[in-house]
Amino acid sequence: KPRFYWAACAVLLTACSPEPAAEKTVSAASQATSATTLTVPTARGDAVVPKNPERVAVYDWAALDTLTELGVDVGATTAPVRVDYLQPAFDKAATVGTLFEPDYEALHRYNPQLVITGGPGAEAYEQLAKNTTTIDLTVDNGNIRTSGEKQMETLARIFGKEARAAELKAQIDALFAQTREAAKGKGRGLVLSVTGNKVSAFGTQSLWAS
C-alpha cells in the first residue's frame, strides 16, 4: 500500500507541476514579439513589421505625403523634389538616395527599423529587403481612392495613428462630395496635368477617373 500511495502522489505531482522553464521562456518571447510587431497587408502579400518604429526610411512620395499628414516623422527619404507641401519632410530627413537609386551606404548608416517603398521606388524592393524589414505599399492607380485609403489605414496601424487617419478620411470624403456636387449638370469634364512645358490629358480609364 505505501508503495502504491507514493507512486500515486508522484503521478499527481507530475501532472500538477508548472510548465518547464524553457516552455515559459518560449511563451514569453512569443508574447513579447506579438506585442512589438503586427501583420499588415502590402502589395506583395502580408508582412510582419515593427509597431511604431522610430527609424523609418521612405522610398515612396505618396507614402511620405501620407505619413506627414498622419504626423509621423520620417528620418530618411529620397533626395528632395519640387513639391511644396513635402519640403518640410525633406528638410528634416536624411537623404538616402533617389526614388530610383537608393544609396545603400547612407541607408546602412541610418540603420532603419523599417523601409517603406512603393510605385517606381518598389523596383529596388528585393535589394532593400535583403538588409532590413521592407514593405511595398504601391497604390493601385486603377482604383486610386480605395487603394490610397488602404495605404493610409496600413500606415496608421503601424504608427498608432488610427484616430488621425479617420479624420483625414472624413476630410477626403467631404472633398469628393463637394466636387461631385459642383460638377452636377456641368456636362463633360477634362482633367489636365501641367508639368514644366508639358500638358497631359486624362480620360475615363486614367488614374484620375477613380
Annotate each PLM feature.
Residues 3-7, 15-59, 163-192:
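Bacterial Sec-exported substrate-binding components of ABC uptake systems
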Residues 111-117:
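Proline-aspartate-enriched helix->loop->beta-strand connector
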Residues 79-83, 121-122, 138-143:
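Short, acidic/turn-prone active-site loops that include or flank metal/cofactor-
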Residues 52-72, 145, 150-152, 169, ...:
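N-terminal hydrophobic signal/anchor transmembrane helix of membrane proteins
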Residues 81-86, 202-210:
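Alpha-helical, coiled-coil/dimerization segments enriched in small aliphatic residues
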Residues 131-197:
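Extracytoplasmic substrate-binding proteins
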Residues 55, 60-109:
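A short, structured surface patch at a secondary-structure boundary
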